[in-house]
C-alpha cells in the first residue's frame, strides 16, 4: 500500500502541525499584559477628567471675578 504523500510532503505537513501546536500552546500559557494596559487606560481617563474639572474651575473663577468687577 502506497502512502498518499511523499516523504518531503509529510515532513512539511508535520512541521506545520508542530509550529501550529507551539503557537497554540504559547497563546494559552502566556499571560498577557492586559492588566498593565487597563491601568494605563484608567490613568489616562483620570487625567482627562482632572483636566476637564480644572478647566471648569478656571472658568467659574473667571466668571466670579468678572461679576465682582461689574458689581
UniProtKB/Swiss-Prot annotation:
GO CC terms: membrane
Sequence segments annotated as region (Disordered): 31-71
Alphabetized UniProt keyword annotations: Glycoprotein, Membrane, Transmembrane, Transmembrane helix
Coiled-coil ranges from the UniProt annotation: none
Chain intervals with Basic and acidic residues compositional bias: 56-71
Glycosylation site positions: 58
Record protein name field: Small integral membrane protein 31
Ranges that cross the membrane: 8-28
Basic residues composition-biased segments: 46-55
Subcellular location as annotated: Membrane
Membrane topology qualifier: Single-pass membrane protein
Lipid metabolism found in the keyword field: no
